[in-house]
Amino acid sequence: MKKILAVFAVFGGGGVLMSADIEDSTLKAIFENFEKSSKNDSIKAGLSPRQIELSNLAVIIASGSLRLWQERVEKSELKADEIMELLRQSTAYLGMARIREFIFVTSEIYKRKGVKITDFALESDENRLKNGQNLQIELFGLATTDSMKGELTQIGKYLSQNCFGDYYTRVEILSLIEREIITFFLLAAQGDTSAQMKAHAKAIFLQGLNKEKLIALINANIALIGYPRSLNATAAVIEASK
């Protein structure tokens, strides 16, 4: 007889309702065995456990799995500032509407543990724009910023100032290659992001992670993301490498 345990966790103000947890020992064994073996294969391919964990966490956020996120954060060896920085960056690709509860729950975890999160002052609009554009050029070349004209002028400015200027610039917490890995897997987990995945795959190549390693990193996420989106992400990587 299957044991069904309904767990409701309500946090003040936000009111997060945790879904019912259906205990299935067969599925649990299959999932854990496959995830472990795929991660081991990726490590053999030259990836670090840190790179794998960052990609896994990005997939979990983009998939909206709040419970799994809580479980992984509780066990994570990443620093609190690194976890929170990953969440902040995710806001640019998923939006605050999807990230808010993750931020709230994560903050509660670190409050309970007595861990303080570092706050950072907001740069001026001019500096954020300039620094963001410089990072875009480093990652994608001049063509990217030059292409944002006409109807795309305003969103192009926001991309430079907000998406890159507000988040990517804190490379002392997460490096550029780590941020690109996070972004790629935020995109991969959403689906219908082939063009964006190709662009960020090219940026990852420029940062020193080759096609084979990026595909191995995708394989380390199949258990979480599923086969269709893993195949789509792999196709984008292959196309970007041509």
Model regions and ranges:
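Generic cytosolic/nucleocytoplasmic N-terminal low-complexity/intrinsically disordered segments
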Residues: 1-2, 212
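Classical Sec-dependent N-terminal signal peptides that target proteins to the secretory pathway
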Residues: 2-20
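Acidic, glycine/proline-rich low-complexity segments that act as flexible tails and inter-domain linkers
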Residues: 18-50, 62-75, 92, 96-178, ...
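Conserved active-site and cofactor/substrate-binding residues in soluble primary-metabolism enzymes
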Residues: 50, 81-82, 177, 192, ...
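Short, structured motif recognition centered on aromatic/hydrophobic residues
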Residues: 52-60, 86, 178-188, 217-218
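Short, thiol/selenol-centered motifs that function as redox-active sites or metal-ligating centers
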Residues: 55-68, 189-196
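Short, mixed-charge aromatic SLiMs
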Residues: 76-92, 203-216, 221
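Glycine/small-residue-rich hydrophobic helix-like segments
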Residues: 182-183, 188-212
